[in-house]
UniProtKB/Swiss-Prot annotation:
This is DNA replication complex GINS protein SLD5. One of its GO terms (biological process) is DNA replication initiation. Keywords: DNA replication, Nucleus. The gene is SLD5. The GINS complex plays an essential role in the initiation of DNA replication. Required during embryogenesis. It comes from Arabidopsis thaliana. Disruption phenotype: Embryo defective. It comes from the Eukaryota.
Length: 220
């Protein structure tokens, strides 16, 4: 027969872990990992996940000190490990995209709005360090017209040396509900694709981009 403390521990476990934040974090991680561009930073979700992780860590320490059933402790530890993995992986994927597309993320208003304040600082430092490195090792040795980090030459009208995300990349996605999307850019063709709830689709990212942002579609 379980002791009162063990029974209480089990009840607390059910209460603490009956949250959708871990599933939301998993969704954010999957979308971020599969998308060719950086997505909107899930600040509120990350903050809640950090608070939950701290709470579970404190709970584990308390249960170990009070001799709670090791099985209950192990359940907490598994959920803690899962939450920590998802959070770290989510943030790591974003940092990799910031490093890869640092100039694009800083020069594009849409991309910059998706970054957290800390990510903006990180992107700025990365861009400054890379620009300084190029200037010291290569650019200052070239003719003046070719000393730009962003352009092939000063006569270029656009930043043609800046790597950008390939939005034409094909992705695998699942629709949460029935969705009808245009297959082409506005003014090109009225052809649409109808996506049924729960079905998987292999489709160009830019077609489902807005539906992903609105939460109608998840990447796999």
């Amino acid at each position: 027969m379980a002791s009162n403390s063990e029974a209480g521990g089990s009840a607390d476990y059910e209460t603490l872990m009956s949250t959708s934040d871990v599933e939301l974090l998993k969704r954010a991680w999957r979308n971020e990992k599969a998308a060719p561009e950086i997505l909107q930073y899930e600040g509120a979700l990350v903050d809640r996940a950090k608070e939950q992780i701290e709470l579970v860590e404190e709970t584990i320490e308390d249960y170990v000190e009070n001799g709670i059933d090791p099985l209950v402790v192990s359940l907490y530890q598994m959920d803690l490990d899962r939450a920590q993995f998802l959070l770290r992986s989510y943030l790591r994927v974003r940092l990799l995209k910031i490093e890869k597309f640092m100039f694009h993320n800083l020069n594009s208003e849409e991309a910059e709005r998706r970054l957290s304040e800390q990510e903006k600082v990180f992107a700025t430092r990365c861009a400054d360090d890379l620009a300084k490195h190029f200037e010291e090792t290569v650019l200052l040795k070239l003719p003046e017209n070719y000393q730009s980090v962003l352009k092939q030459s000063l006569i270029s009208e656009v930043d043609d040396m800046v790597p950008q995300p390939h939005l034409d990349t094909f992705v695998v996605c699942r629709s949460k509900n029935f969705v009808s999307l245009n297959l082409y850019e506005e003014g090109e063709s009225p052809e649409t694709v109808e996506m049924e709830r729960g079905d998987l689709y292999f489709i160009r990212y830019k077609i489902v981009k807005r539906a992903i942002e609105s939460g109608q579609i998840d990447l796999i």
